[in-house]
Amino acid sequence: SDVYKRQVKSYRKELWFRVPSRRGLVNITGEVEKALEESGVQEGLVLVNAMNITASVFINDDEPGLHRDLEAWLEKLAPEKPYGQYRHNGYEDNADAHLKRSVMGREAVVAVTGGRLDFGTWEQIFYYEFDGRREKHVLVKIIGE
């Protein structure tokens, strides 16, 4: 049978970021689409994973008002200051970043159909940095055929 002759491909790419401010939102959809094209995968899955515990990858609409609302909502849930409100901040000042990451999650998974990311209307992939000003990376792992 033809099914047994198919070979699953695996492709890995790292996307590096240095967000100059403490918090920042980056639309990485284009970079993920480029990685998918490089992989040659036509049918499968893409995992996009923040490789730091103070950053997130998620899917949403690329609309500036929504971005401001998200920032305000996260700041209400886990305000950056006063630093002394967090037990983690004995030697660091980023407990809020860890909590925001816990709420927003680590990764996004997107189906690949016909060599393209299979999104719903308006969906885009974002990297959200909660404790920036240093280099961090995102893992893009693509599997399929």
What is the predicted role of each segment?
Residues S1-Y4:
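Short, small-residue-biased leader/transition segments that mark boundaries at the very start
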Residues K9, G40, R101-V103, L117-F119, ...:
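Solvent-exposed alpha-helices and their adjacent loops that cap or buttress functional pockets
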Residues K9-V19:
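Short amphipathic
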Residues Y11, I53, M104-R106, T113, ...:
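A generic structural signal for well-ordered coil/turn residues at beta-strand boundaries
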Residues G24-L70:
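Active-site beta-strand/loop microenvironment that shapes enzyme catalytic pockets
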Residues L45-L47, S56, V109, Q124, ...:
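Structural motif
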Residues E71-G120:
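Mid-chain, well-packed structural core segment of small domains
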Residues G120-E129, R133-E145:
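C-terminal binding/interaction regions
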